[in-house]
Amino acid sequence: VLRWGDTELAPPGPGEVRIRHGAIAVNYSDVNVREGGFYIAKPLKFPVIIGNEAAGVIEELGAGAEGVQVGMRAAYVGVGGPFYENTGAYAEARNVPASCLFKLPDKISDDQAAAMMLKGLTASMVIHRYCKPQPGDAVLIHGAASGVGLLLVQWCKHLGATVIGTVGSETKAEVARSLGCDHTILYRDVDFVSAVKEIVPDGVAAVLDGVGKDTFAQSIYCTRRYGMLVNYGNASGHPDPLDLLLLAKHGSLIVTRPAFSDHIRDAHDRAHYSDELYDLAASGVLKVKIGKSYPLSQTAEAHRDLEGRKYAGSLLLKP
């Protein structure tokens, strides 16, 4: 249950800043926190303010807050602790550690930042640490019209890959194709394994999966010898346990399930990957698709639309 209401916000503590939100991201992890699902390391004491990602402007500094100033534009993705426990972005303003902030350049708007920081850095993690396709490689992207999926479609296409995407509707297929997806598969209507094999008989070099339970197990049969499966999200639920012998049987496959927080743990990495993301977005290599924006008071509607997979791209809340 989501309720709209007022709460008092204390002054920022030592090392913290108060950030006035301009745009707030709606992510599947927020739904999971709301439901008390598998991401949670320990039970939450409800009620809580959920949300992990937002962009805005710093309006007050706590003692000892370094590297920041009042009036600076910034974004954050988590606040440095357990990613799905230290929530609180679904608010007009919030106190966060200065150390968790990404400074925003003028070329990136609040809406762009909120729509792409978690999703874009997730795509960056997949590309740089696990699967950087070579020109001519075929890649299968599940949920190709999602926020992360659309960024992966564009990034893989930019690197010269043949991109195959699964989507839930023809409308989403059109969006994915418009941003570079070479082949789209309506996975609810056809067997996506057979459809992939018709396009690439030997299988794809990599499967990039943010859907999870509905797609991951069958993806083994889409992958070529020595291929890789990357599960980076679980929109349909956590994948079932995997028999490791299947990986040997179907071509010495590699499977990984990375943690986003590890990708941005190092300060140098945070700066490097965020700067790259800003440049790719500003140059038009990555176009950030915003499916819909909602007033913050209509958060429940935004969650219903996200769970119903109603829109392609990212959903935002506007304070």
Regions found by a protein language model. Give the residues of each.
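Short amphipathic alpha-helix with an adjacent loop that forms part of the alpha/beta core around
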Residues: 191-201
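Mid-domain Rossmann-like dinucleotide-binding core that forms the NAD(H)/NADP(H) cofactor-binding site
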Residues: 113-190
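N-terminal Rossmann-like NAD(P) cofactor-binding module of classical short-chain dehydrogenase/reductase
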Residues: 75, 140, 205-208, 230
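NAD(P)H dinucleotide-binding glycine-rich loop of Rossmann-like/cofactor-binding domains
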Residues: 67, 76-143
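Glycine-rich phosphate-binding loop and adjacent beta-alpha segment
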Residues: 159, 167, 214-286, 319
